[in-house]
Structures are given as C-alpha cells and as structure tokens.
Amino acid sequence: MEYSIIHLSDLHRIKPENIECIMSSFEIEKARYAEMGLPPVQLIVVSGDIVDGSKEKDAFVAKQQIEQQYETATKFLSDLCKLFIGPKQEDRARVVIVPGNHDVSQYISERSMEQIEHDDNEIEKLADALWSDKEEGADIRWSWKTLHFNRIVDRKTYNKRFDDFISFYNTFFSGIRKFPKDPERQSYLIDIPDLNIALACFNSCYQLDHLRLSGYISPRSLSALTSDLIKAKNNGRLIVGVWHHHTRGLPNQSNYLDYTILDNMVQNGIFVALHGHQHISGMINEHKDVSSDAKLNLISAGTVYGNKRDIPPAISRQYNILVVDMNSEECSIELYSREDATALNEMPAWDRGTIGRSLKTSHKITIPITPHLVLEEEEKLQNDINQINLQIEKSGNLESGIDQLIALGMEKPLVRKFVLEMLQRTDNHIRMIQLFSDPQNIAEAMAIFESSIRNKDRSTLIKLMNLDIVKTTTDASIKSMVAEAKLVII
C-alpha cells in the first residue's frame, strides 16, 4: 500500500484575495506529483495556526477579525480538499486539523485575567509560584510588557479562549467529528482502516495564553486515548501523532513543547509525529525509549503562507509531502520538502526545498508495524465495557457500573482504566484508595495521590512516595503531587 500525505502548517496570513493564486500553485503541484512519481494524495494534515489571530483590545473588533480569518481558512482548506481528496462534505474526513498558539483568542484570555497588586514582600512568593509546577502557580502569569504579575480570576472565561477555533472546526467537520471542549482532554484518534493509519491528535496549547507561551500536552489527553491506541496498535495501524509545537528552543526561548510527555507517546506506539510552529521543514529523532530501542521521529512543516516576519533567515514558505509505503511488518515514510522559489510573491512557485538547515530535499525513515492481532477475548472485554458504559449513561448509577466493571477483573489494564475514569467522576476517595493503592501507571498514581491528599491519608501517601513509579518519574504532575503530599504528611 502506497499513498501521499500533504502536511501543511502555520497558514497565518492567507487573505480572501490570495486564495485563487494559492490554489493555482497547488493545481500546478498536483500535476507535478505525477511527474515526480508520487502516489495519489489520500490525506491532508494541518498542524496548527490556522489563523494569525488579533491583538485588538476591542473584543468585538477582535472577534470579527478572527471570524473573518477562519472564514478565509475554511475556503482555502475546502478548495484544497476538493482538489486532492474530493468535493463532498464526507471527503473532509481525510483532512486532519489541530490548533496552534495563534488559534488562542487573545481577547478572551486577556478578559479572564487581572493584574495583581502586591507589595515588595510578596514578589518572591509570586515568583516562586510562577515557576513552580504546583497547583498554586497554575493561575499566575508574568507580563514582560507591563512588568507585572497577573492572575487568572475567571477560569470559565479562560477556558473559552479556543471557542473561535472550536466553532471553525465543528463547522468545517459538520457531520464528521467535533472538537473536544474539556481543556484537559482535547485529543482524539482518527482511524482510517483502508489506509491502515491512525492519527492521534493533540492540543499542545494546554494552559497557553497571551502571557504563557510554552507548549504543553495534558497527560490526561493522552490517557483518554489509551484504549483507542491499544486497539489501533493491535489492528496493525501506523500511529501518527499530530500537534503544533516543536520540542527544542534557544536558551532565551520558552515557546516550545514540554518534552516530558514524549516518553508516554513512545510507550503508546507513537513513533512518528507531525508538527509546525518553528516555520521550517525538518525531521529529528527527538526521543528514545532505551528499554525497547524505540524512537520518536518528529517531522515539522514550514509556514505555507507566512511573510518575511514569520520566516527564518534563508528559508522561504514551505510545506511537506510524505510518501507512505506500508506492508504487514514495516512502513517507510519519505519526506519531501517543497519550498516557494519566489521572493514571497502572492502566487507561490513550489520547488524542491531543504530539510532543516541541511542541503537534503528528501529523507526516508522506517517505522515498525505491530502485526494485526485477532484478539477475540480482548474484543469481548471491550464490548462488555462498552455495554456497561451505556448502562451507566442511561441510569446515572456510577457505583453500580463500577461494581460491574470490577467484576470483569481488575488485573486487566483496560478494566482498570475504565474503573479509574468512573471513580474520578465520583467523590468516593476512600474507594479510590482501596482499589488503586498499588498504581500501575502515571494516571493511576495521579488519581491515588489526589484522593489521598483530599482524605489526608498519610500512610497511603508515604507508601506512594516510596514506589519506584513515583521516585523515578520525570512527570511534572507527579512531582507536583509529591510536593503537596509532603505538606499533608508534615
């Protein structure tokens, strides 16, 4: 099986009057793909920054500007889908979109914060909170523009800063999929059986706003996909991660991804991921799991229509073509960088581009594929769990549903995952402690820490802090919980 994927990122500055010229350039490209011997395009991936955003202080004007930008992006992406995939609404199922930092509506995040009035004695305390990973620092921000601390005072408003993006997303994919609203679980898996690929999509802008620029993927957004990722792996899928941020930056920068989540990505079978943000085409092996020799290959796309302000020196507009060649045991992915040969003219002239700062115009990697496993017992277990979940949703009786799940066997990871999720919807911290006092993974450790802290269960907290899974972790959330636990124990 062989097919091509178009990987775009950082649309930023496309205006209505630009669309005709851009689409003409892609019509020329489509004809050249055949000359280059590339297989047909079956997927379009857009890894964030659909719009440029607005810095207008007037919320009404800012919202109008952003909505106009999303209308333009919708027109461009619709035309691109028609050109390469098909003209029907259902053809948009082959388009994959995640948000970027420019998709955060600044006028909303500004409205959710207030400047903190403080005396000199409080500065050190506020600074410690700002740079700590404790819960108390989650709402503190620093503005270099005003040289003042700020605090999120309206979390409900703050959580609406992606509403403009979500409105665009849900309209574009009407009848196909919706973007998750829960900030801690903004992830979804797009499974495409006839291409034998599954795309694990994440919002890497968790807790990002106009004052906090660092990229971060909520661990809960990954844990929410665990069962889907296991199923995709057992079905022999190539699993591809998609998010916005790159993972490396200069010492004076902070606008890149917190890399601590990458180990979890590899453990979940994600060995290749697509991103943008740095405005340059590239490929790196960012993270390795020493125990299994597995590695995560990160592929970045440049900005498809930025201007001189957006583009690094000696680089022009760029996008990627990925050629996927798959058999039952392995998959090769060849990256072709395409670059605008003009001086940023209104109509790009695409040609061979470079990958990173090298002179290479293409590069191939090989990814192992898990053989398709026909696991009747596991499929039956999943069906049983689905039935119990349906009963819970109908009856609202969580405790009864939890009992039924436990009866399926707590030694089974899938059962444990769903029991944990159901218990987190209750306030039954005692039962949480009883069932998960020996956590098997980070998600369980987080939950048992939280319940033990709320219950002031010192003996369980001491036991947790001495577990290898806690002592050896680099997970910032666990470290934060350990710090809180120490305060309870004292």
Locations of the language-model features?
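Conserved beta-sheet core of the metallophosphoesterase superfamily
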Residues: 194, 251-328
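Active-site neighborhood of phospho(di)ester-bond hydrolases with catalytic His/Asp-centered motifs
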Residues: 7-9, 42-49, 94-101, 239-244, ...
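Active-site environment of divalent metal-dependent phosphoester hydrolases
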Residues: 14-16, 51-55, 97, 101-108, ...
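Extended active-site neighborhood of metal-dependent phosphoesterases/phosphodiesterases
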Residues: 71-220
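A short C-terminal boundary segment appended to hydrolase-like catalytic domains
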Residues: 323-413
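Active-site-proximal segments of metal-dependent phosphoesterases and phosphodiesterases across multiple
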Residues: 206-272, 278, 283
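Alpha-helical repeat scaffolds
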Residues: 398-408, 429-441, 461-473
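N-terminal active-site segment of His-dependent metallophosphoesterases
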Residues: 1-95, 105-106, 227-230, 234
